[in-house]
Amino acid sequence: MKFKIFLVIFIMIFFTSCSSDKENSSTENTDNASLTQSENIDFTLKFLDGRKMYVKYHEQEFSFDDTAKAKLFVFFTTWCAPCKAQIPHLNNLNKKYQDRFEVIALFLEENKEQEILTFIEDEKMKFPVAIGESNFAFSKILSVSAVPTMVLFNAKGEKIKEYLGLIPEEMLDIDIQKAIM
């Protein structure tokens, strides 16, 4: 008798768990779909140095208020080992093409500003860092699902290339040259 009761409870918990996962999953998919299929999304990236960048997403095209340079947006976290390993290479590329290109880091975590500043100092990051809710909105529009993810845009706001994981500096260099032409 105890076995039957246990079995019934187990089955109820199993089906309840599965159904709530499906509900969460469908809600999440709906949120993503509405965000990526929206005709007009505007937001502002806020940088630790006080600078702001206005971003507009309209009919699956991006425009940035700063059109002087090509941009490599790097989505990452403080706990991601490949993200940390990529930093010296990104510093090199940011310095090499500083007149026509910039690396922009977007943290996808809600750390306190002081924690992020400590991370930047410890890891010797030499490129702008954006923090805040807009980073999450931008990552949803671009369907970022893992870190590190990097997305390269030319100065006109056209998406050139997307990368997932640790990418060799030489490969990034070649694509950056294409983006700044």
Regions found by a protein language model. Give the residues of each.
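Hydrophobic beta-strand anchors of alpha/beta hydrolase catalytic cores
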Residues: 72-73, 103, 150
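N-terminal targeting signals for export/organelle localization
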Residues: 1-53, 181
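A short beta-strand-turn-helix
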Residues: 44-71
